Structures are given as structure tokens and as C-alpha cells.
């Protein structure tokens, strides 16, 4: 287990260095397979429950099997696996971009409910993934625009926010737990789709980069600069109301 944790730490460090390099140069990688591999590795890292869900469960005291039964993804929080596989490449990237906006808002709401290191690492992972999503969308559409090599700005999520907050702190904890479980499931599916791009290249006309360039696929908006999250000690407010301790 210690070796696996060390491996994840090294992978995270490598991905962070790649992100910093891209932002520093202001350019995206023009190599499709290299960029695709980075996206696959980032998705693999973000799907790991030990990066976010497990620290949340530990800190909130949700260890028991009975409570785990109620820590479930709510239908509609994230696009389904079937829906993701049906999307064209550009639509898939746009869906990832939109969903990352929801995840960033949720991370902001959970800032006081997660260990500081886990929260900062998760935020960095989402930003880096969003940066490479933009780079891939730019590569597929054949754009020469070098700007906006930045992570995604939080935008509209895939589903509306709940109209009313949960009736108790305990229910809010379970709701947040289910959201994080869904987040890891979503990233696992996203990684599978991205691996499918490499495995099926040359066989799928719909997912062909050349075809995407020829048909002038819909443009994914460049990612504007992301807002800085509120510092610890100044809670931004819960996604479903102010957290009650």
C-alpha cells in the first residue's frame, strides 16, 4: 500500500510539472498521442477514491457499512457512462469542461470539510485536467490560437442545483459523500472513453481527429482564468446551504 501511495504521489508531481510547463510557455502540446496519454493518466489519478472520497469519509466519520450504504451517487449528478460513450469527441470534451465547473464549485463548498492537502491536490488535479481538455479541443479543431492555456472557469453544471438544502447536517454529509463517489465514477468512465480513443483510432469515423478537423466540429470555448478559491478560514458556503457543524 505504501508503494502504491508513493507511485500516486510521483504521478501527481509529474502531472503538476507538466501543467506548470504548459502554462509557463503559454502553448499547448501539438502532439496528439502525448496529450491523450496525459489526459488518460490524469483521469486515472482523479478516479482514485483515496484522493478525495476516502479523506472526506475519514474526516466526517462515515466509516460504518450502514452509512456507506447511503453514500451513493445520485442519478443526474454526472453524465452516465452510456451517454459519454455516445458523444463525439468535441461534445465529449465540452461535457468534461462543463462537469469540471460543477466539480470546482463543489470543491469550494467542501473547503472546510476536507483535509487541506486533499482539497488543494484535488483542485490542482481538476485545473490541470481542464487545461489539457482545452489543449485537446484546440488540437482537434486545428486552431493556431496560442492563448488561453488555462484551466476551466466554473460554469453551469450538468444538472441544476437542488432547490432546498438537506434538512440536517448528517444528510448533507451523506449527500456530499455521494457526490464525491459519483465524481470518482465519472472520472473512471472518462478515462475509459479516452483510452478508447487510442484503441479505436482508425476504426471509428465519428471519433477520428482528421474527421473532426474536416467537418469543423463545434468550438469548445477557450478556458478563461479560474477564480481563486476562498482561503481556508473564510468558507465560501455550502453548495446546499451553509455547513452546520
From Swiss-Prot:
Give the source's domain of life in one word: Eukaryota
Membership in a protein family: Belongs to the LIF/OSM family.
Q: Name one Pfam family in it.
A: LIF_OSM
Kindly state which keywords UniProt assigns to this record, in alphabetical order.
Answer: Cleavage on pair of basic residues, Cytokine, Disulfide bond, Glycoprotein, Growth regulation, Secreted, Signal
UniProt keyword Disulfide bond present: yes
Give the UniProt record's GO annotations in the biological process aspect: immune response; oncostatin-M-mediated signaling pathway; positive regulation of biosynthetic process; regulation of cell communication; regulation of signaling
Q: Which cysteine-cysteine pairs are annotated as disulfide bonds in the entry?
A: 28-135, 71-177
InterPro entries in the record = 4_helix_cytokine-like_core, Leukemia_IF/oncostatin, Leukemia_IF/oncostatin_CS, OSM
Q: Which stretches does UniProt call biased (Pro residues)?
A: 153-166
Q: What is its main location?
A: secreted
Compositional bias ranges of the Basic residues kind: 203-218
What is the protein's known function? Growth regulator. Inhibits the proliferation of a number of tumor cell lines. It regulates cytokine production, including IL-6, G-CSF and GM-CSF from endothelial cells. Uses both type I OSM receptor (heterodimers composed of LIFR and IL6ST) and type II OSM receptor (heterodimers composed of OSMR and IL6ST). Involved in the maturation of fetal hepatocytes, thereby promoting liver development and regeneration.
**What residue range is the signal peptide?**
1-26
Q: Which organism is it from?
A: Bos taurus (Bovine)
Q: Where in the cell is it found?
A: Secreted
Extract the PANTHER family matched here.
ONCOSTATIN M, ONCOSTATIN-M
PTM summary from the entry reads: Propeptide processing is not important for receptor binding activity but may be important growth-inhibitory activity.
This chain's protein is named Oncostatin-M
